Design a protein with these regions (language model features):
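Glycine-rich Rossmann-fold phosphate-binding loop(s) that bind the pyrophosphate
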Residues: 53-57
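C-terminal motif of bacterial Sec signal peptides marking the signal peptidase cleavage site
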Residues: 16-19
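Conserved N-terminal/central alpha/beta ligand/cofactor-binding core
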Residues: 39-47, 65, 71-72, 77-151, ...
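Conserved beta-strand-loop-beta-strand element in the redox core of flavoprotein oxidoreductases
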Residues: 153-172
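Flavin (FAD/FMN)-binding glycine-rich loop and adjacent Rossmann-like elements that form
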Residues: 170-171, 175-177, 185-459, 463
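Terminal recognition/anchoring or ligand-binding modules at protein termini
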Residues: 23-26, 499-632
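Positively charged n-region of N-terminal signal peptides that target proteins for export
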Residues: 1-5, 10
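Short, low-complexity, disordered segments immediately C-terminal to signal peptides
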Residues: 21-39
Length: 632
C-alpha cells in the first residue's frame, strides 16, 4: 500500500503548526493523520541474504541500507507498526547530534527520515507512516509485522537465521547475515554473546536509571506555554526553558516539586512536543523499580504510571501555566528504556573515546551527545558527565565477540556503560545501522571473508565500507577536537574518577578543578573508590561539611589502615607519612595538602582518589572493573 500523499500533507501541517498560536492551531487543526495499517504477505520466502530483527528506527535503517546494497532483506518487526521508541514509545523529541560549530553529524538514511517527518517534534502517526513508506520503497525488503523473535538458529557458533512466532505458529528464516536491532540486544543474548548489564562494567550492575512513560494531553494553551518557558523567573537572568516551533522545554521547578503517590516515581522538567491535532506529548514522568528485560515488569510500570497520571494532570492544572485546562488523552504503548544490556564486541567505545573526541581506525559513524546519566531511585537528579564535540564509532563496536554471522546496532552495541550515556541515542544507532547494511554487502561480496569479524582485518574492505557509506549519503568527516581539560596536570586522575561515573563536567566540560571540595564530596569520592575496588566499604569515611586537609587525610589514612591491616596513624603528620609510604600521596599532592588548616582543590582530590584506587587494587580481595581507567 503506497500512501505518500499522507506523509507530504502531514509534514506540511507540522511545519505550519510550528508557527501557530494555540488558538489558531485548534481552530485550523487538520483531521488526525490516518495511520496506514500494515498486513503481512502470504507465502514469503524463508531464505534471504540478510535478516534484520526489530522494527526500531535502527532496524528500519539497517534493512533499507542492506536492500539498497542489493541484498534480499527480511525485516522482522515485533510490533504492529514500525518505529519502536520513536512511535510506540512516542519519544518524538529527536536528539540531533550537532558539533560545536553547528555541523549536523549524522546524515544518510537518518536525514531522509528527519526531513520527511519535518524535523524534531514530529507527529507520531506521520512517523509510523514514514517508516513504512521508506521500507515499501525498497523492492528488496520483505516486511513481517507482529513477528515475535523466539530464538536464533545457531550452527558452529554462528547465527544462520532466526525462529519467530507469527499468528501463533513458529517460522524459521535463514540468512548468512543477521543484524540485531533490538534495543536490548535480545538476539545476541539468546545466541550466547557475552554482555554486561547496566553499570556492571564499573561495579554498578544494580544501577537503575529510571524509565519514562510519555503521555499525551489535550487542551494545552501553546501560546501561554511558549511565553512562560521563555520568561525568566524573578532574580534570574535567563529563562529555564525555551521554545522552538512545536517543541518546548521547561517547568523544572514545577516538575520536581510534584510529590508522587507512588514513591518509586518522579516528575522532572517537561520536554513538550505538539502534535498535528494540537495535542502535546510530555516526556517528564520517570518510573523506577522496573525490570526492563521482563515483559510483566514493563507492563506493570506502564500501569503504575497510568494510575499516577490523573493526579499529575490535576497538579499541572493547578500549578503549571498553560496547562490549566489540560486533559489526559492517553500514554505511549511502550516505555522509554535508557539502558539494559551492553554486548561485548570486538571493539568497545569508551568514555575517554567519547569525551576526548577520538578517531577510530575503522570508523563507520560520527556522532555526539552529552554523556547523560539519568536519575536513579536514590539520586534525585540526573547528571551530565561531559559533552563531546564529536567522536567516531568503529566497525568493531558492531561485531559481537565469540558469535559469528551477527551484528548489533542500537544502544546495546559495543559501548561501555558510561560511553553509552552518549552513544545510546537513536540517530547514532541509525548511523551505525546504515553501516551494518553496507558491511553485510561487502562481507557477502568478498570471497575471502568467512565471518563478519574478518572484515576488521581487511583494510581494503573497511575502506570499501567507508567509501560506500559516503557515496550513499552518510557523513564520516571528523575533527578530533582537543579539550582544554586534557592539558590540566590532574587530568589523569580526573579520568579515573570520571570513568567511575563520579565526576560531572556538565554541558561545558567544567569539572571545577580549581575549586575547593566540600567535606561530603570528598568523603563520597573516597568512599566511591573504596567501593569500586571491591573492598569493605563500612565503616565509611566521614568528614565535616567545612573540612580541611588535616581532617581529610587523617580520615583517609584511618580507612586505608583498616583495609590493609595497619595501625591507624596518630596525627596529621603521621597520616601524611603513612599515605606517602603507600604512594597514595606523591610529592605534588604532599605539597598541595601540606597546610593542615587549608582545604585542597578538586584537582588534588581527584588525583588523590585515583592514586588511592591504584593502591587498593594491590590489596588481597580487591578487583578492578574493566571500564574503569587506571593511572598510566
Amino acid at each position: 500500500m503506497k500512501r505518500k500523499w499522507i506523509i507530504a500533507a502531514a509534514c506540511a501541517c507540522a511545519l505550519i503548526f510550528a508557527g501557530c498560536s494555540s488558538d489558531t492551531a485548534t481552530e485550523n487543526a487538520p483531521e488526525a493523520v490516518e495511520e496506514i495499517t500494515i498486513t503481512n504477505e502470504e507465502n514469503v520466502p524463508t531464505s534471504y541474504d540478510c535478516i534484520v530483527v526489530d522494527g526500531s528506527p535502527e532496524g528500519v535503517t539497517a534493512a533499507i541500507s542492506a536492500a539498497r546494497n542489493g541484498l534480499s532483506t527480511l525485516l522482522i518487526c515485533q510490533d504492529e507498526a514500525l518505529g519502536g521508541l520513536y512511535t510506540l514509545g512516542e519519544l518524538n523529541y529527536i536528539d540531533v547530534p550537532e558539533s560545536r560549530d553547528g555541523t549536523v553529524l549524522v546524515e544518510g538514511i537518518y536525514k531522509e527520515f528527519y526531513d520527511a517527518v519535518g524535523g524534531s517534534g514530529f507527529d507520531v502517526t506521520v512517523a509510523k507512516n514514514t517508516f513504512y513508506e521508506m521500507v515499501q520503497a525498497e523492492d528488496n525488503i520483505t516486511l513481517r509485522v507482529q513477528s515475535k523473535f523466539v530464538e536464533p538458529v545457531l550452527e558452529d557458533h554462528a547465527v544462520t537465521g532466526v525462529t519467530v512466532e507469527e499468528d501463533g505458529e513458529r517460522v524459521t528464516y535463514t540468512a548468512p547475515v543477521v543484524i540485531d536491532a533490538t534495543p536490548d540486544g535480545d538476539v545476541c543474548a539468546a545466541a550466547g554473546c557475552d554482555y554486561t548489564f547496566a553499570g556492571e562494567d564499573i561495579g554498578e550492575r544494580d544501577r537503575e536509571m529510571g524509565v519514562t512513560l510519555v503521555f499525551r494531553l489535550s487542551g494545552v494553551d501553546w501560546e501561554k506555554v511558549s511565553e512562560f518557558v521563555q520568561t525568566p523567573e524573578d532574580g534570574e537572568s535567563a529563562a529555564e526553558g525555551g521554545v522552538n516551533g512545536n517543541l518546548a522545554w521547561g517547568y523544572s521547578t514545577e516538575g520536581y516539586a510534584y510529590e508522587p503517590e507512588d514513591d518509586a516515581m518522579r516528575l522532572r522538567g517537561f520536554n513538550i512536543a505538539r502534535q498535528a491535532n494540537g495535542d502535546v506529548l510530555i516526556n517528564a514522568l520517570v518510573i523506577f523499580d522496573v525490570d526492563a528485560l521482563d515483559a510483566e515488569s514493563r507492563a506493570e510500570g506502564i500501569a503504575r504510571g497510568q494510575k499516577e497520571l490523573p493526579r499529575i494532570v490535576e497538579y499541572m492544572n493547578e500549578n503549571c501555566v498553560g496547562f490549566e485546562k489540560a486533559e489526559l488523552v492517553d500514554t505511549a504503548e511502550q516505555l522509554y528504556v535508557r539502558e539494559t544490556r551492553h554486548i561485548r564486541c570486538e571493539d568497545t567505545l569508551t568514555i575517554d573515546d567519547v569525551l576526548e573526541n577520538r578517531s577510530q581506525e575503522a570508523a563507520i559513524a560520527v556522532s555526539n551527545y552529552p554523556v547523560d546519566v539519568q536519575a536513579t531511585k536514590t539520586q534525585t537528579y540526573g547528571t551530565v558527565v561531559g559533552f563531546p564535540d564529536q567522536y567516531e564509532i568503529g566497525f568493531g563496536s558492531l561485531i559481537p565477540q565469540n558469535i559469528d554471522g551477527l551484528m548489533i546496532v542500537g544502544r546495546a552495541a559495543g559501548y561501555t556503560s558510561m560511553a553509552a550515556g552518549s552513544a545510546r541515542i537513536v540517530p547514532t544507532g541509525m548511523a551505525c545501522a546504515q553501516a551494518a547494511g553496507v558491511a553485510a554487502r561487502v562481507a557477502l561480496e568478498d570471497e575471502n571473508i568467512r565471518v563478519l569479524r574478518d572484515l576488521l582485518a581487511s583494510d581494503a574492505d573497511i575502506a570499501e565500507i567507508q567509501q560506500l557509506l559516503t557515496e550513499q549519503g552518510a557523513r564520516l568527516d571528523h575533527t578530533e577536537t582537543h579539550e582544554a581539560v586534557m592539558d590540566h596536570w590532574a587530568y589523569d586522575g580526573l579520568k579515573v574518577i570520571r570513568s567511575m561515573g563520579f565526576a560531572d563536567g556538565g554541558y561545558d566540560n567544567d569539572y571545577r578543578l580549581d575549586e575547593t571540595v566540600s567535606g561530603p564530596r570528598f568523603a563520597n569520592m573516597m568512599n566511591t573508590v573504596v567501593k569500586k575496588s571491591g573492598l569493605a566499604l563500612e565503616p565509611r569515611i566521614a568528614v565535616n561539611e567545612e573540612t580541611n586537609n588535616e581532617e581529610m587525610l587523617t580520615a583517609l589514612a584511618e580507612k586505608v589502615a583498616a583495609l590493609d591491616g595497619s595501625a591507624a596513624p596518630a596525627d596529621f603528620a603521621a597520616s601524611v607519612q603513612f599515605l606517602q609510604a603507600r604512594n597514595i600521596l606523591d610529592a605534588t599532592l604532599a605539597e598541595n595538602f601540606a597546610d593542615p588548616s587549608a582545604t585542597a582543590d578538586a584537582a588534588s582530590c581527584y588525583m588523590l582518589a585515583a592514586r588511592l584506587y591504584e593502591y587498593l587494587l594491590t590489596l588481597p580481595g580487591a578487583s578492578a572493573y574493566e571500564a574503569i581507567d587506571r593511572l598510566s
